[in-house]
Amino acid sequence: AQRLATLPTAYGGTGREWESTLNAAGALDGYREHIGDVNEADAIHYLAFDLQNPSSICNCIEFARTNARAVRTALTIEMWQSINTAWLEMKRFQAALGVRGPIDRLELSRFLDFIRKASLDFDGSAHRTMLRNDAHWFSRLGVYVERADTTARILDVKYNVLLPDSEAVGGSLDYFQWTA
């Protein structure tokens, strides 16, 4: 979302970029059901903060913490701390969002940087502190299955939805979309 929001607007800004982002996230149908027409502000809110979206970033952190509490004894201290810290920080972002309304680009950038760091923190703590037993390998398998699924969705959206018919493959818009 952070890079997509910074794409040059010389291409007409039809909103297809955000529609394709919702589609790649598997959230387009739910978005249309709850919100309707696709626009940047609503798409960002739906993907990041909307509690009606079960796959929003905030809901994912909430569910991760709930699940971690259920299996607390199977987690290392570092793993628990990383999940709990992410949950507490997310609550701070939600409280600030409730006071100010729609999130501005600077705060969105901070939020997405925080999410990236929290994800890397958990992944690093899991990789470095877990015993190499079935639980470790099962969690790694889950990571790779999710990666493969997301990669397949992105490739599908990129070549079937995003690039306008008038734009050449390998052109400037194609370049900006791939780097976003």
Question: Model regions: which residues?
Answer:
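Alpha-helical transmembrane segments and their helix-helix packing motifs
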Residues: 1-180
